Amino acid sequence: MSRDSIFAAARVLVAAGPVAGVLGAWRRRLAGLALLAAAAAAPAAQAETQFFSLSDFQFEDGTVMPELRIAYETQGRLSPERDNAVVLLHDALSDRHAFDALIGPGRLFDTDRYFVVTPDAVGGGESSSPGDGSGQDFPRYTIGDAMAADYALIARGLGLARVRAIVGRTMGAFIGLEWAVRHPEMPQRLVLLAPTARSDANFRLLIDLMTSAIALDPDWAGGRYERNPVEGLRHAGRIYYPWSVTRPYLERIVEDALAEESEASAKAFASWDANALVLRYAACREYDAIGGRGTEPPAALAPAAMPVLLIASAGDRLIDPHDARRLAAALPQARYVEIPGDLGHRAIAAPPGTPAGEAIGGAIAEFLK
């Protein structure tokens, strides 16, 4: 989890408590929780960034990239049996540091027990992306392409035939499910946070709105910009923000907190290269692990026969819990957990020490035993 997302989660936690109506008290509580969250977010040890290159990588649309670079980190030691690897796949707006608060000795992903692998997905972080200078010429990659690159890293780069678990959050859950369907022999277990089998109409339309906001910035220049369209990115972040929480949450937090959180979302979006963000969400928009909208999932998901833990958040307006429940019903060995509360989608990234974070961590720890 990035430091910015930790502070955002701390803001969410504060606003989730009873509103006293006194802004000064709210700010004092926020400052204290932000410090605690920042401490929890610090990784137990600084991992070295490594790179794996794939020659002549072919994307699903047929485009071939002469060299595709995947950035990743590893923590912990691979067992003599080579059977203790855990692969953590981040969400759309994050990178390989998304789970830092949960990695280390004695933490959820205990590096005294697991060999933890955290890659940057194709199109972002330090992996090959439009931000490298290719811009609009970067291939229109899919979730399947992201999965194929991560799979190659594990199978060829690290030489692993099996992993103890794959854990994915939102976009990472999309990649994880694709992985389980296409390469079911590799993961012994699968953990999906805010999962679905395909992007629904609500999610696709939200992505269209965000993309339109970016394109309306004069600096966008059809995607061949000389200056990153920061204002368009900021507007996209403001559009995204209210969908990341629930309506009851928005109704009861103090007005200043509402504006502050909206601007934090705008700032997070503005930190991206615009082409990289547009392509990242385009991949999420077209995600469909079933193969045809309007179809039912069971047959397509049959290969994913390993034990699967699905964790959804009540009231999530980005990835509807109903979709996660339906997905759970279609998987041969599924366990479903729903996190209560009104944080909506944000609950999925709640830091350790918060009610949502502890509930998620407890469910994963029990599942990985």
Task: Give the ranges of each region predicted by the language model.
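Catalytic-loop region of hydrolases
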Residues: A45-L88, R96-H97
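Conserved hydrolase catalytic core segment
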Residues: R164-A165, T170-D200
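Alpha/beta-hydrolase-fold enzymes
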Residues: M186-P187, V191-K267
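Catalytic active-site module of serine/aspartate enzymes centered on a nucleophile-bearing elbow/loop
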Residues: A334-K369
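Short beta-strand/loop motif that positions the catalytic acidic residue
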Residues: A304, L310-A312
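Conserved alpha/beta-hydrolase "acid-adjacent" motif
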Residues: R317-D323
